[in-house]
């Protein structure tokens, strides 16, 4: 627990009590938060009103409002800070309208890791990743290519970020080591389904699938830092991943050839299929489907874990809206 960290559950409870009472009172407080993102918005009268979000202790995320005539706004607009890296002390007011930040200033003595959710053991996930590669039937040449692309031997910044970064901002595996865990699960899914379906895979195309799955989300190490979008995130992790691949194309072409490089390039570009550049190869489509399968199953599993259901409860207290793959508790109606 972060000393002097903001207790968002208590803050939310206070806001709810103020709303329920119909009171106009405000409650002041302060706390420590890891700066995440902020974006400018406006009130009904067109006055600037940025929206700010940050991580509090235990990985919870919280959103605030910041008025343009307050010191907190000046800090966000003028001072140097790094999203996902800068820890700040905030002074705020709670009212029936929510939480408003009055003042914000950087504070020393805190580590961003103190605010980030840990669900995975990085060593365990690293071992699982290596095991999944061995089980894939990929050639030693493919394993060597992956090792070079992910800089396993050098253990440099690229490798560290791949092993530590989040897989998503707010969906599945949005936690420390989530990217590595998601990638490993995708490899495991592939290992399972390729025994049931032919897909006309041979040694070369199996290598193609394994390498593609291993690096399909590599762009996320540039898109995010500590689960927070960075300056060029608007390019998307697919665009940043393609850029990374071009920088390392010699690794692939020296082991395979130019066509092989572009086949992997197409997977990174198209693995979101209808949500991006549509899949134009079988391999891009397969990676897209495997990626979606893990995202869906991981979201279900995380919801069950968060609710702390027993085995029997998990089987009976969850309902699904298949059209949107949304998860609902049994005691809630879809309308809610």
Regions found by a protein language model. Give the residues of each.
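OB-fold (S1/OB) nucleic-acid-binding surfaces
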Residues: 43-70
């Amino acid at each position: 627990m972060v000393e002097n960290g903001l207790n968002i559950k208590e803050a939310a409870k206070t806001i709810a009590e103020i709303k329920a009472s119909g009171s106009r009172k405000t409650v002041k407080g302060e706390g420590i938060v890891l700066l995440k993102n902020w974006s400018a918005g406006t009130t009904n009268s067109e006055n600037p009103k940025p929206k700010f979000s940050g991580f509090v202790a235990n990985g919870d995320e919280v959103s605030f409002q910041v008025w343009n005539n307050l010191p907190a706004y000046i800090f966000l607009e003028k001072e140097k800070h790094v999203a996902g890296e800068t820890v700040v002390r905030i002074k705020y007011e709670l009212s029936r309208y929510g939480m408003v930040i009055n003042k914000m200033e950087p504070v020393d003595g805190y580590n961003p890791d103190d605010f980030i959710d840990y669900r995975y053991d990085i060593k365990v996930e690293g071992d699982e990743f290596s095991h999944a590669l061995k089980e894939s039937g990929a050639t030693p040449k493919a394993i060597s290519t992956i090792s070079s692309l992910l800089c396993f031997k050098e253990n440099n910044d690229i490798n560290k970020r791949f092993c530590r970064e989040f897989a998503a901002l707010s969906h599945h595996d949005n936690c420390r080591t989530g990217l590595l865990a998601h990638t490993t699960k995708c490899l495991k899914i592939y290992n399972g389904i390729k025994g049931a379906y032919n897909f006309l895979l041979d040694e070369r195309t199996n290598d193609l699938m394994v390498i593609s799955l291993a690096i399909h989300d590599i762009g996320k190490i540039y898109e995010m830092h500590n689960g927070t979008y960075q300056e060029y995130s608007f390019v998307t992790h697919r665009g940043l991943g393609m850029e990374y691949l071009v920088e390392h194309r010699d690794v692939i072409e020296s082991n395979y050839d130019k066509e092989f490089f572009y086949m992997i390039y197409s997977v990174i570009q198209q693995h979101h299929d209808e949500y991006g550049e549509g899949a134009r190869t079988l391999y891009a489509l397969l990676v897209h489907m495997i990626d979606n399968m893990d995202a869906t199953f991981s979201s279900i599993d995380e919801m069950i874990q968060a609710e702390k259901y027993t085995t029997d409860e998990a089987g009976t207290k969850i309902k699904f809206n298949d059209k949107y793959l949304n998860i609902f508790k049994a005691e809630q109606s879809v309308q809610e």
